[in-house]
Swiss-Prot record:
The gene is murD. HAMAP family: MurD. It holds the Pfam family Mur_ligase_M. Disulfide bonds: none annotated. It comes from Zymomonas mobilis subsp. mobilis (strain ATCC 31821 / ZM4 / CP4). The keyword Cell wall biogenesis/degradation applies. This is UDP-N-acetylmuramoylalanine--D-glutamate ligase. It is found in: Cytoplasm. Belongs to the MurCDEF family. The lineage of its organism: Bacteria, Pseudomonadati, Pseudomonadota, Alphaproteobacteria, Sphingomonadales. GO terms for biological process: cell division; cell wall organization; peptidoglycan biosynthetic process; regulation of cell shape. Its EC number is 6.3.2.9.
Amino acid sequence: MITSPVFSGQFYAVLGLARSGMATVAALLASDAKVMAWDNNPETRDRLQQQYQEAIDKGRLVISDPMIADIFGISAFVVSPGIPINRHPIAALAKERGIPIIGDIELFAQAHGFWERHGRRCPVVGITGTNGKSTTTALIHHILKEAGLPTLMGGNIGLPLLAADPLPDGGVYVLELSSYQIDLTFTLDCDIAVLTNITPDHLDRHGGFEGYRKAKERLFLLQSSPHYAVIATDDIPSQVIAKQSAAHLVTVHADNISAEDQVNWPNLQGPHNAQNAVLAMAVAHILGISDDVISKALISYAGLPHRMQKIGERRGVLFIDDSKATNAMATAPALAAFPAIHWILGGVPKTADLDPCKAFYNHIRQAYTIGQAGPDYAQLLREAGVNVVECGTLEKAVRLAAEEAQPDEVVMLTPACASFDQFSDYEARGQAFKKIVEALD
C-alpha cells in the first residue's frame, strides 16, 4: 500500500468506508496516523472493528461519527467521492472548524510530493472528462505496459489507489479522475493532465453546468508551467479550458485519426474511440514512447467491460454492451459506429432530450426503451420517425430485439441514462445484459 511520513502523527477523520475508504484507513494507520472512521452502514463498521481491533485497543482508531464526536485535533476530513459534499452537513462543520475536506487522491498527491522532494521521480498522468476517460486511461496504461515501463492505473478505475504498492523511480501513475475526486484534491500537480471532452453531467452535484465545467478545469489550474496539458478541443467548453491552462498545451481532435488507421484497432471503433486514441497517442509521445510501440499497443488493446464490448453473436446478429454510456453524448458515437442497430435505451435520464443522437437515427432499425426514461424517450423517438417499442425491462427489450434483428445487424445496449432505477450501477446493468444474451435460445 501507499504510505508516507507526511501522514505520521496526524489525526484524520475518514467518512465513507467503501473500497477507497477502507484502503484510506489502512494506509493512514500504516503511516502511523490516528484515524476516526465512520460509515452509516453498521455492517461496514462491524467489519472495520473486526479487522482493526488492535488499533482500536491502542487508541489509534476510533469508530465514531465525526458529526457528533469530539473532533479536536483533526487534520482533515477524508471523504469518499460518493458523498455529496454540497448536501452533506460535514461541509458546514468543516467550515465552522476550519478543517479541510479532502479525498484519497489528495492523500496520494501529498505522498507523491514527498517522494519527489526526496528524489523519487514518478510522473503522474491525470485523465478527466465527461465521456471516454476510462478508455483513455486504460489505453494509456496499456501503451506504457507495452513499452516496458512500470505503471499503475488507479483513481476512478480499478483498485483503490492507496491500496496499491508504490511504483519505483521512473514508474508512471495513470489516474482517471472524476469531477468529484478533483473537488477533493488541492495539491495534485499532474505531469500530464488530459481532458477528453465536457458535456452536461452530474449537474445536481455541481450546481449546474458551469460548476461542473469548473470542477474539470481545476485539474489544469493545479498544474505548474513545466508540465503538459493534453486537451481534445472538439467541444467549446474544452476549448475554454485549453485557453486557461498555464502548462505546455497540446491540443488534439478526433479527426486527427484516419479511418484507415482505426480499422486496424479492433477494440477502438467509433468516433469516440478515435478521440480516446489520439489523446493516448499524444501522452505516449510526451513520455518518449516510439511510434512502433504505440501502433502495436493500439492493435492489441483489449478494451474495457461495458464500453462497446462485443458480448457474442447469435444467428449472425452481433450483441454489444455499451452500458457505460450513461448520457446521450456518450451514446451518440456508439450509434455512429454501426449502420443497422436495434437500440436498447433508458434508465434514469440526465437530460430531457436525445439531441446528440439525432444525427444517427438513420442507423436505428428499432429502439426498445426501458426504465424511468422509457415513456418520454419513446415519445421523442416516435416524433422523430424512429420505430420504438416500450419494453420497461431490460430482459424484455433484449429478447424482443433478438427476435427482430436480422443477420448483419446489431443489438446494442447503449442506454444514454444512469442505471439506478433498476440496477445498482452501470456494471450490474451490463452484466445483466450479458446474462440475458447468453440465455437466448
